[in-house]
């Protein structure tokens, strides 16, 4: 597995923060780092396989990656990321206690993926741009300024994440997308889902299309197909069983949609013919 090293990304040995844009981010094989990072998805879509679990990421997704986490990107479509790298929560010169603002693992569950709405994403961009402008400066005031900006970024993300902000339709749509990640195999009635998240059906369609480029049903089908592809690669379950587990009642229909989406049949993926398992 590829290991990315801090010496290749941080501007100096004393720098506690570095900015690494990926505009766009192409498919990238599984890797880990000797540093931590916050991945901010600017726009586009893709699959982020994080410690073996696939997540659909779109504009407004924020991923917290620790040094020991392994992850990869696949099936990217104009996916643009900004990575905010930091050595460790306890490797800042002027800040202490940052770990309390980061996601915490509890009973083996690590909430690695958050979402923020478009207006918050704009504020995030401004903070990141300020950090990036100061990367060439190594004096103490500049170092302190970058670390303060990093603290402001963490505070903004924490206050604005799904867990704490449901006051507008954009935030409720983000919550809906997170709900779909857990309930993709359920039978989804879009009228009922819109009511559940206090959205009109028209608003749901419009905002989801704006954020993902897909209609709600197309997004759900793609999510199901992504989950199915992951199971085909990493489980011994039959194609029929995987189809049912991922929300498809007809395995033939599943195979047709799968080939249309990936240009490979489920059997091709199972046998590694797409090159993923080579």
Swiss-Prot record:
SUPFAM superfamilies assigned: Homeodomain-like, Regulatory protein AraC
Keywords annotated in UniProt: Activator, Cytoplasm, DNA-binding, Repeat, Rhamnose metabolism, Transcription, Transcription regulation
SMART domains listed in its UniProt record: HTH_ARAC
Matching InterPro entries: AraC-bd, AraC_XylS_family_regulators, Homeodomain-like_sf, HTH-like, HTH_AraC, HTH_AraC-typ_CS, RhaR_RhaS-like_N, RmlC-like_jellyroll
DNA-binding region(s), residue ranges: 191-212, 239-262
Pfam family, one: HTH_18
Domain HTH araC/xylS-type: 174-272
Any GO molecular function: sequence-specific DNA binding
Intracellular or extracellular location(s): Cytoplasm
One of the protein's GO biological processes: positive regulation of DNA-templated transcription
GO CC annotation: cytoplasm
Function: Activates expression of the rhaBAD and rhaT operons.
Binding partners and assembly: Binds DNA as a dimer.
Protein name: HTH-type transcriptional activator RhaS
Name of the coding gene: rhaS
């Amino acid at each position: 597995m590829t290991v990315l090293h801090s010496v290749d990304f941080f501007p100096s040995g004393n720098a506690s923060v570095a900015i690494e844009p990926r505009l766009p981010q192409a498919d990238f094989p599984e890797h880990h780092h000797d540093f931590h990072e916050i991945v901010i998805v600017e726009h586009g879509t893709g699959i982020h396989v994080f410690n073996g679990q696939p997540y659909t990421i779109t504009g407004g997704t924020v991923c917290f990656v620790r040094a020991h986490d392994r992850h990869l990107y696949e099936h990217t479509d104009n996916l643009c990321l900004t990575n905010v790298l930091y050595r460790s929560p306890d490797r800042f010169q002027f800040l202490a206690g940052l770990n309390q603002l980061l996601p915490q693992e509890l009973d083996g569950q690590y909430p690695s993926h958050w979402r923020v709405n478009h207006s918050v994403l704009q504020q995030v961009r401004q903070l990141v741009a300020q950090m990036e402008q100061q990367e060439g400066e190594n004096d103490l005031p500049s170092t302190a300024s970058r670390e303060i900006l990093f603290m402001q970024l963490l505070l903004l993300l924490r206050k604005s994440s799904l867990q704490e902000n449901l006051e507008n339709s954009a935030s409720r749509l983000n919550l809906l997308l997170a709900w779909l990640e857990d309930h993709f195999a359920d039978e989804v009635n879009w009228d009922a889902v819109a009511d559940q998240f206090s959205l009109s059906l028209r608003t749901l369609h419009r905002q989801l299309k704006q954020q993902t480029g897909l209609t709600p049903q197309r997004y759900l089908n793609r999510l199901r197909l992504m989950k199915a592809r992951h199971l085909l690669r990493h489980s011994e379950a039959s194609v029929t069983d995987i189809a049912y587990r991922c929300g498809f009642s007809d395995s033939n229909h599943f195979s047709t949609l799968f080939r249309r989406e990936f240009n490979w049949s489920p059997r091709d993926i199972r046998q590694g013919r797409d090159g993923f398992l080579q």
